[in-house]
Amino acid sequence: MVDLRILRMTRLSIPLAASTAFLPLAAYANAECSGHQLLTAPRPETSCREIISQIFVSPDKATHASVLPADVSLYATPDMESRVVIRSSRGDTLTSQDHSSPRGANGYYVHRAQWSPDSEFFVYSMISSGGHSPWSFPIMVYSRKKNLFVKFSDMIGGAPTVSGDFQFSGPHTLTATTWKQPGDLDNKVPISVDLEQAIEKLATKQ
């Protein structure tokens, strides 16, 4: 599910190596370039020349969050792992978070993302690029006031989130899903957190 506030799909050009001319055109045409897929054979190194990013604009239009394919492993589509970049509406980069792994098989890609109604928090859930713990959907929270990313699990005593879906109520209260008892994946329960209060509590502990 993609937030309706995606402003546009931008295309990033990737410079081609000098060896490009020696690869058959069919290799590029047949390359898998999206869909969060693992590939049985490596795609050409200079394939997927146009990488698509998703841009999420805050309700007040002041801040943009870009979800970019990390493009680490040739045995996967470029979007198998993600980077998240936060920018002002003027184009200034405020901060970023890289969810890629050294070999492209132990990181995460963004599953769902959304700004809070008050524009103070950007929230996104993720899925493991290597298929590890398929029941787990880590959620990250970006605080515009603090200009930092924090794990939602740190706000709920270290418990995992077991669904990629979440929703907002009020200006910045987030409701996600965790387990009722540790290890019990058959009994899931909703949990709601006031993100502003939770961020302040975490800040005082640091």
Task: Give, region by region, the residue ranges found by the protein language model.
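N-terminal secretory signal peptides that target proteins for export/translocation
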Residues: M1-T10
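Acidic, small-residue rich beta-repeat scaffolds with periodic aromatic anchors
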Residues: N30-F56, Y142-Q206
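Beta-strand-rich domains and repeat architectures in extracellular enzymes and scaffolds
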Residues: P44-P78
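Blade-terminus and WD-like Trp-Asp/Gly-His loop motifs, strongest in beta-propeller folds
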Residues: I55-P69, A113-F121, G164-T175
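Beta-strand C-termini and the immediately following turn/loop, strongest in propeller blades
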Residues: V67-P78, Y124-S129, A176-P182
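Structural motif
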Residues: T77-V84, G131-M140, G183-V193
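A short beta-strand motif characteristic of beta-propeller blades
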Residues: L94-G104, L148-S153
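Short glycine-/Asp-/Thr-/Trp-enriched loop segments that recur within the blades
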Residues: P102-Y108, G158-S163
